[in-house]
Amino acid sequence: MIGLILRLYPPRYRQDLGEEILAVYRLTAADASRTGRFREAADIAAHAVRMRLGLSSATAAGRLLASAAPYAVGAAAAGCGVHVTRWYAGVVASPSPAHLSLLSADTWTALLLASALVVVGAITALTGRWHGGVIAVVAGLSGLAAATVVSGAAFGDPVITPAMALLTALIVLACPPDLRPGPRACAAAGATAAVAWLPLVAVQAHVLPFSTDYGLWPLLVLAATGLVLALRSKSPGLKEAAAMTVACPPFLAYAYTGGWDMSLPVLAIGAAVPLTGAMAAYAYHLVQRGRGRAERAGLR
């Protein structure tokens, strides 16, 4: 089996390092259980696929995915958190006991449990246990995608919602393991998720007297996050905008189902909103560069 896995590597990489990888695997698997050997082989296969696709920490694509991964996790948590709080609001308003809705083995229950798993996994990942949290997030998103296809319009569009859920899972999985997000990035992603989620819950609970976001509020939050990150790092904002764009599939699904149910406007806005933040950050960068030139000219 390990021989077939090694074939996943690019030919040049396999020629240079294939024997070394094989030797390390045999040494590690010698005293390992069957589960341990399977896990080691799975890790090698994942690394081989990343190298084949150019998604390692040495490539720009890999670094982009690493920057986007915590925000993708936060976006998934915010979207699924809306499902969970919507269910809770229904339970509060219903005269039936809460446990009866959970004990009924139907598609709605599967959707709810998958959403709860995503939320718990995201909290786990963003509070320091990234690997275990990501496993829960990916499992929850996969379950959500499957249940949404079966349920129809219960939790969203039967095509767009599962497609965006699976795309988010792939984005999170593709993050290079040696570029796991640090505490600051995780804290920022958690704050972004909270700011995206809380007003939506307030609107559903009729705490706010109006609702005019048409599904776009979470995308606006991502754009603002990219702008803030660009301003803090004093960069043109292109990297931050790209990361926010990669992280936005869960919010695109929400905009599609919670807004107009029209794919073209939502996709256009999903691409334009993060880029608006990049343009604003780039304008700030140009102003700062102009000031620097003026100061240097004044010193001459």
Q: What would you call each of these model-derived segments?
A:
Residues 1-31:
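Disordered, charged N-terminal biogenesis/targeting segments of membrane/secreted proteins
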Residues 19-96:
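Cytosolic juxtamembrane regions of integral membrane proteins
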Residues 62-300:
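Hydrophobic alpha-helical bundles in membrane proteins
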